[in-house]
């Protein structure tokens, strides 16, 4: 939105019929509109409900990691949903290997919701530092099977012994119903038993959840479109 548009919304002539909503107009005059990210903008244009599905996954992570000291998001993309987790934890950092998305994240950063974002290739080296929560949504399915151990080992390296990890991915069964855009790059989707077995190599406790659309459940997993592994007690 241009400065002239912001000024128009903030002038005396632009008054809402109900006074409690005037703050919406005034806020735009002060800071402009919040903007969607690269991927979330495309979703909102092409398939609005898909943006809701993605945000619901972040909401689940936010509630599971609520109260954490410092959480790391791996494969943040445009980080549009990251703020939902940030709202529930004391500190958050996010990383991705694609600078195009990271520059977009930085360009949209606002002071109230500022967090650390940095580039890192998980196939090249572990992430330094220490975190009591690590999560990756819609990432593992993009990692070839032969690179999976390297990726997970490096991703989990900074997780403290008492920390929690959450891994989310589309189910293998969902792929026959997925759109070409959704399937693009998916080279390592798993069934629920496969994902649980994978994460049990790294954790003593792995709790599995299913998702259909925005609903999280523990129902019949072959009919789930999305899988979430909640992991604790590192091996």
What are these regions (language model features)?
Residues 2-135, 146-153, 158, 188-194, ...:
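Conserved N-terminal segment of class I S-adenosyl-L-methionine
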Residues 126, 143-144, 176, 199:
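Activation segment
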Residues 138-142:
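Short catalytic micro-motifs in class I SAM-dependent methyltransferases
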Residues 167-187:
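Short, glycine-/aromatic-enriched active-site segment of Class I SAM-dependent methyltransferases
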């Amino acid at each position: 939105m241009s400065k002239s548009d912001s000024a128009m919304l903030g002038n005396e002539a632009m008054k809402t019929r109900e006074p409690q909503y005037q703050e919406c107009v005034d806020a735009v005059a002060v800071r402009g509109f919040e903007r969607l990210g690269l991927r979330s903008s495309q979703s909102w244009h092409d398939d609005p409900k898909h943006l809701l599905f993605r945000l619901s996954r972040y909401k689940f992570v936010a509630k599971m990691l609520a109260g954490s000291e410092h959480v790391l998001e791996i494969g943040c993309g445009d980080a549009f949903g990251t703020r939902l987790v940030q709202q529930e934890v004391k500190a958050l950092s996010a990383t991705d290997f694609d600078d195009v998305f990271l520059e977009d994240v930085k360009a949209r950063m606002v002071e109230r919701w500022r967090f650390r974002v940095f580039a890192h290739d998980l196939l090249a080296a572990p992430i330094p530092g220490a975190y009591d929560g690590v999560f990756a949504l819609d990432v593992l399915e993009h990692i070839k099977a032969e690179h999976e151990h390297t990726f997970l080992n490096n991703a989990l390296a900074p997780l403290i012994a008492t920390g929690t990890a959450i891994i989310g991915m589309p189910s293998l069964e969902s792929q026959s119903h997925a759109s070409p855009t959704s399937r693009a790059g998916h080279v390592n989707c798993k069934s629920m038993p496969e994902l649980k077995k994978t994460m049990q190599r790294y954790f003593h406790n792995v709790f599995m959840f299913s998702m259909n659309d925005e609903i999280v459940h523990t129902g019949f997993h072959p009919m789930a479109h999305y899988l979430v592994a909640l992991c604790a007690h590192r091996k």
